[in-house]
Amino acid sequence: MEEIKPASASCVSKEKPSKVSDLISRFEGGSSLSNYSDLKKESAVNLNAPRTPGRHGLTTTPQQKLLSQHLPQRQGNDTDKTQGAQTCVANGVMAAQNQMECEEEKAATLSSDTSIQASEPLLDTHIVNGERDETATAPASPTTDSCDGNASDSSYRTPGIGPVLPLEERGAETETKVQERENGESPLELEQLDQHHEMKETNEQKLHKIANELLLTERAYVNRLDLLDQVFYCKLLEEANRGSFPAEMVNKIFSNISSINAFHSKFLLPELEKRMQEWETTPRIGDILQKLAPFLKMYGEYVKGFDNAMELVKNMTERIPQFKSVVEEIQKQKICGSLTLQHHMLEPVQRIPRYEMLLKDYLRKLPPDSLDWNDAKKSLEIISTAASHSNSAIRKMENLKKLLEIYEMLGEEEDIVNPSNELIKEGQILKLAARNTSAQERYLFLFNNMLLYCVPKFSLVGSKFTVRTRVGIDGMKIVETQNEEYPHTFQVSGKERTLELQASSAQDKEEWIKALQETIDAFHQRHETFRNAIAKDNDIHSEVSTAELGKRAPRWIRDNEVTMCMKCKEPFNALTRRRHHCRACGYVVCWKCSDYKAQLEYDGGKLSKVCKDCYQIISGFTDSEEKKRKGILEIESAEVSGNSVVCSFLQYMEKSKPWQKAWCVIPKQDPLVLYMYGAPQDVRAQATIPLLGYVVDEMPRSADLPHSFKLTQSKSVHSFAADSEELKQKWLKVILLAVTGETPGGPNEHPATLDDHPEPKKKSEC
């Protein structure tokens, strides 16, 4: 019996017919007997060499694996035929001139292998690359290829199963592997080296891609800076120079945007463009970004004033029509991309974190031994520090945006848009009625300092909720209750109201209790810090006794040590309640609590700003003096009515609220402000309206009261109605001057004074 080696290749080509024909024509035209023996050696090496997946996609087909696993060994001494026969397989392609010889020898061995055929499994040929499916009805017999001593599969093999290398490349690869084995190297080591080479090339490509992304985003960023600097800023400054609004406000909004634009457009962007052109010789960006470090101070100034800028844009858009008109006109242009001014102003804040992200990705791909490693790492450290400040500003902007959304959902009636307010949690919940314990649908907005308890509105447009109760976090307690009929209940007890609430599930209940308790704890921690600061300050100031106030310079409390006025405890904000220092005790107080002046001995007897308490101790005061120094709403009605341009009772209505009678006064000392009191002798005004910028509508609607008129500015609408047409015209004469900024002189005889009306006690209640 002959010994048959396991089959590892087929005489049938795995290439498509076109490639087979091409290879056959090559062999027919250029093969010789001398080359044929060489071909035999190469093919024998190829067939015996292990075929592992590699760069060129060499794979072993399922049929080849099956044959190699199940072919039996043929015992015998007849090896002359297998050793002396010519090879009929060359790299998996049948040579045309030897095909007939191979077929004859296969036929000769077919009859002697019947027993072997019976033991072989059936092989099916499936559709490959769209070819038809042919299933062998007879056992597929592995026959001995007399050309090289290997068994070949006689079943039908579909072309195109895997890529086949050209003969020259296949032979070269085989010789390399043989040489490796002779040198003691394994094919796996070569494969790892190849993969390492490919990885190196891949990293280089990724580094170039990151650098190119930096360049592309920098171009887009410079375009945004041009939009802010050359369009928004310039157009608004032109309008301000016409006298529509102060130019100083425009400068505060845009801060140092011109300097930032100049740096990026004239330095950083040209440097990046030049470097990308020279990337083949200088593949690095760390040295360029390191030059960015000294200019990050510009971003610090921009980010620091960002909150104030956003507040200014909001207020000026609402109150100044000319400002709003210019901004909206620019926002309609294609260059804005349907985005608002506030959105574009956020671009510089977001840019620094973008640099940080790209640099981190760049360093991950950069080899540690690269020349750019140290520069890139140093740049990342500097930029990461600046990015932390930018991220803080982004979070504040996102929080402010959310507050505006809630403000609109509540019908713009709750004053919640304040940088000090932070939304913690919101969601739907059920409220258990006290009388019949029925469950009613409610909605909660939890902030860091209050809980808004709201009732849903079932309307397609407008506000979605009505605020039923505002419960302060100060003094709030959370109690977990047990109710068999109503599960998942808990109680929120505050100074303003106690609510028994029902969550939708045990998890929802747990989340609400956790959020509420953490908010309460954080609130108390802030106030504890505040109280400790005061106590510590009192210890430090123990040397400055009451008798020494004004005689000895105090230690000033730092601005960042407090978040609220140390006298009235109202929270500070950048726009309406700024920080001031009392020159006598050093406390940080608001404008209202520091609206006093006293002579301080340690400062040479100069009049200096002091708080209310220090003013009382240093100067002493009378009741009348105290009244003169009260806030704008605390000015007594009798004071302004006796020295006013016009004053009388008017019917007043705001938004959808009902009409109510109010004592209205425009004083001579403040002729551009309308004061409204409940009665002529009230010591505090209910509201004030700065008249500058309002639009006056003299024509009442049919639904309004007779002799009515309206004051409109942005979303604020105030409706008034006089008792007569004559009184209405007297008011309009004064108001029409005030809304344009002109100061009415005011006649000696007031158009409508207290003498024109009986005492309030004789009239109906307001």
From Swiss-Prot:
GO cellular component assignments: cytoplasm; cytoskeleton; cytosol; filopodium; Golgi apparatus; lamellipodium; ruffle
Phosphoserine found at? S702, S716
List ligand-binding residues for Zn(2+) 1: C565, C568, C590, C593
The answer to keyword Metal-binding applying to this record is yes
Tissue distribution is:
Expressed in different tissues, including brain, cerebellum, peripheral nerve, skeletal muscle, heart, uterus, placenta and testis.
User: What GO MF terms are annotated?
Assistant: actin binding; guanyl-nucleotide exchange factor activity; small GTPase binding; zinc ion binding
The identity of this protein, by name, is: FYVE, RhoGEF and PH domain-containing protein 4
User: What high-level taxonomic lineage is stated for the organism?
Assistant: Eukaryota, Metazoa, Chordata, Craniata, Vertebrata
